[in-house]
UniProtKB/Swiss-Prot annotation:
It is a peripheral membrane protein. Required for accurate and efficient protein synthesis under certain stress conditions. May act as a fidelity factor of the translation reaction, by catalyzing a one-codon backward translocation of tRNAs on improperly translocated ribosomes. Back-translocation proceeds from a post-translocation (POST) complex to a pre-translocation (PRE) complex, thus giving elongation factor G a second chance to translocate the tRNAs correctly. Binds to ribosomes in a GTP-dependent manner. SMART domains: EFG_C. It is found in: Cell inner membrane. GO terms for molecular function: GTP binding; GTPase activity; guanosine tetraphosphate binding; ribosome binding; translation elongation factor activity. This is Elongation factor 4. The gene is lepA. It catalyses: GTP + H2O = GDP + phosphate + H(+). Belongs to the TRAFAC class translation factor GTPase superfamily. Classic translation factor GTPase family. LepA subfamily. Gene3D superfamilies: 3.30.70.240, Elongation factor 4, C-terminal domain, Elongation Factor G (Translational Gtpase), domain 3, P-loop containing nucleotide triphosphate hydrolases, Translation factors. Its main location: membrane. Residues 2-184 form the tr-type G domain.
Amino acid sequence: MNHIRNFSIIAHIDHGKSTLADRLIQRCGGLQDREMSAQVLDSMDIEKERGITIKAQTASLKYKALDGQVYNLNLIDTPGHVDFSYEVSRSLSACEGALLVVDASQGVEAQTVANCYTALDLGVTVVPVLNKMDLPQADPDNAKQEIEEVIGIDATDAIPCSAKTGMGIDEILEAVVALIPAPKGNPDAALRAMIIDSWYDAYVGVVMLVRVVDGRLAKGDRIKLMASEATYNAEQLGVFTPHTEARQALEAGEVGFVIAGIKELQAARVGDTVTLIKGGTGGAAFTATEALPGFKEIQPQVFAGLYPSEASEYESLRDALEKLKLNDASLHYEPEVSEALGFGFRCGFLGLLHMEIVQERLEREFDQDLITTAPSVVYEVLKADGTTIKVENPSKIPDAGRVNEIREPIVTVHLYMPQDYVGAVMTLANQKRGVQLNMAYHGKQVMLTYEMPLGEIVLDFFDKLKSVSRGYASMDYEFKEFRASDVVKVDILLNGEKVDALSIIVHRSQSAYRGRAVVAKMREIISRQQFDVAIQAAIGANIIARETIKALRKNVIAKCYGGDISRKKKLLEKQKAGKKRMKQIGSVEVPQEAFLAILQVED
């Protein structure tokens, strides 16, 4: 066990985690040169295209150190984006150490800090590394100073490297061996292994990625999952080098995969503990009684409705979501029915990027044609009878008369940016009802701390932040509390009928403006009918905005030559009566663009 090192790489987006991982794998001979592709560990197409890591991946490497010993290094690659912080905490809880990669030309950014604090909370040893030293604008001294000031860890011995050119890679490997502690655990105790990740493979069923903490797991052992109490046979074991390599057993301290013929992913919950079954044939002498401390269940922050564009596709969308959930533990969904859109699902996501990626994966990998409603967050509603309910769908909020107060989720937001952009970012944060808590200067970087309603962030805050700061600002946020607020539900009515999927929740101060803007946008999108269509925005029974789409009409008096006005009147009245009858029975098709229109209403 003294020759095992488990470590992961944490960094902000684009600071070079995945490239560094590639170099480490190459240096340890995990892959031949011809198999080296850029970003070996980012296996999804969408990861390669967007240049981000979504799923944590692992590689088990053999490294011969300068002291002549061969060490087993288990590298766990982590995502850097704030939406996937859950993946990061999972990876870190399986490690004893982490390489904190900081781009020497950019310095410390928001997710560097967030992920680094996660690591320190979990008691992981952090080794700072300065990447991109080959760039002419690299400024290592400034980066070191920022690491010390912002994060508060000693960076005097930070290792300079360049993952692109391969400089400093050996020093990093030596530092991993020297500075990161060997795994603690008892090889002779009962087996306890933690599930770091699980995914679904069409051929073998569920594959579990586990970190063995105590004991050993051998091929053919009868295993039990502690949370679900389900029992299985460990059919195949192995490690990733990034290729799969079969093993007869996994020892304490190792990270590897287990295939046990599990059919549904719900059984192999991430964070669960695997142990052996006591007694019986193939049973162990003793079984673990205490589960490992797992990580907290993730709470979705952003909700949206996903509906199939054809009602007949509902089943296939459900299958697609089930399969996707196999691979993405943080996706939540439940069936819901909308009058406007038929049957679909209410899905919960960690954030907007997560939502986009889920949508894109459903469309790409499962060929789904989707209609998505505007994202919303969870509100706490205190009803007049004193009970509290949580509502994640705006159309489900009870009428104003039956509600005492609505509480919206408030988050603490940390914003980092160069000092030139402070003014613009503060203006933006104030527009979004932010309350400034703190402002700190670190060299040329400024860190602003705000309290903000999550509902204001989910629509377009991130995009706007990037545009006002020319891409330099970065952010991360964490949930703080539910707080009573003057928010109202705005319903959109077409010819007096509520369209439930178009309801939005906004602050009362913005309600009239948002109502008008949505109604105007809807007017452009809905095509003209044979009868007048009234589009209204309402709070309760109070109409706050209205637009009318005029009917298409035939020129009925074209055939009259001169003559009596009453003849023309008669024809016009007849047409009017027909239109009126039509309006009573006619229904209006709401196109997909209408649901997206709500998202694009500028503040």
